Amino acid sequence: MAKDIKFSEEARRSMLRGVDTLANAVKVTLGPKGRNVVLEKKFGSPLITNDGVTIAKEIELEDAFENMGAKLVAEVASKTNDVAGDGTTTATVLAQAMIREGLKNVTAGANPMGLRKGIEKAVTAAIEELKTISKPIEGKSSIAQVAAISAADEEVGQLIAEAMERVGNDGVITLEESKGFTTELDVVEGMQFDRGYASPYMITDSDKMEAVLDNPYILITDKKISNIQEILPVLEQVVQQGKPLLIIAEDVEGEALATLVVNKLRGTFNVVAVKAPGFGDRRKAMLEDIAILTGGEVITEELGRDLKSATVESLGRAGKVVVTKENTTVVEGIGNTEQIAARIGQIRAQLEETTSEFDREKLQERLAKLAGGVAVIKVGAATETELKERKLRIEDALNSTRAAVEEGIVAGGGTSLMNVYTKVASIVAEGDEATGINIVLRALEEPVRQIAINAGLEGSVVVERLKGEKVGVGFNAATGEWVNMLESGIVDPAKVTRSALQNAASVAAMFLTTEAVVADKPEPNAPAMPDMGGMGMGGMGGMM
């Protein structure tokens, strides 16, 4: 296929049009008085959202060069979303400002490589200063503030704060669509995995269709149990102790399952068998997690152990186990706290190393199960359109809160970017490097300016006044007042602000150093089919 090539000024101008189109659509959502954007969906109702990355991903432009510019900025939003989970609109606004200012200077004859150096120096200094002024997040109220600002909803802030308090900062918090109108929190404490009882005859509560075991022993193995003789020695020891037993194995079938069910029905002893969770290497890791949590051992041939040699000492213990048709929940495992902490550390290390999104998700789940539990926020709304929009906002708020726990908080409303202004302005540089620093300085003003514009005010007036205010004092666009942002609970996670600035600068620097752009030439329209006049009904008279 033939290619279309544009060079230097013409190439950058074409791409800038795409950058502006996308950024102008995204930036109307910034701040407490930001508007929504409606996205057409091929099927179902349109999606109404104020989430920057969702809007950016939907935009496709007809002109190939403009589309490349738009896609570059969409990449800024997407990367910021991947790293911090929020701040995508801020990242887009920063990228647009840096690209526009940079292009003015390149057109005026500045060397793009010098500008790039200056931009990188300025951003490094800004990030160092952000780290200095960030404050660690403390207590439930701070978490609620971060979440409420991100979701623009205080009720959501309280829900997320409560969820994090219940399951810990490492706990898994998932979102589900509720059948009702209200948004609720449901917490599953302890370790839960998605395997239910091997036979419905093992239930202890026929109303709820679940088996509840109090202070049970837990036999953990990666083997298939089909012969009762294999586990008879350990069964006899458990019966003597007068305690119930949970068996977690690859499978329990045939004669072994039948014998267990018969003894359960006769009331000889209380036993429930479930299949081991996961598959392959992940199954081994999860069984090991359960063993560490309950203070037991995994009976596996890899360690030279067989089921006949198992004793009650090698079994795990827990305060309570609840088994339903689909899930097993182990509560209050009596494992050694030091070993559990070591295991959590090991999983954290794996989390940092992995590049796979799927592996990261699974490791996060394992970490949460060891750390304390899973919280489910059930999102409710009156219509499907509102439900989708609300779910996206809560997802952003959740990511924002996690980022705040990791790296602390800074003043919100774009104030923190203006608070690093003096530090960046003090960098000593000459020529094009100094121009690059000025490009970043101009971009640092842009989020505050846009928040003010969206609130119906004159952006430049707000920016100029903010430059003269003390660190931490900013403009509350929701009320139109000048307040101490941290004290008023208007905060942003430092990680979100840092990621937005870093990613915007990275793409802007690449954009400015672009000298040629190559795109596919649009194909000419295929000629229309020839007229088939002779095939009309009149022309087919001879066929009658």
Curated annotation (Swiss-Prot):
GO terms of biological process kind: protein refolding
EC number from the UniProt entry: 5.6.1.7
UniProt entry tagged with the keyword ATP-binding: yes
Keyword field: ATP-binding, Chaperone, Cytoplasm, Isomerase, Nucleotide-binding
Pfam family, one: Cpn60_TCP1
Subcellular localization(s) per the UniProt record: Cytoplasm
Protein function: Together with its co-chaperonin GroES, plays an essential role in assisting protein folding. The GroEL-GroES system forms a nano-cage that allows encapsulation of the non-native substrate proteins and provides a physical environment optimized to promote and accelerate protein folding.
Family, as annotated: Belongs to the chaperonin (HSP60) family.
Protein name: Chaperonin GroEL
Organism: Bacillus cereus (strain G9842)
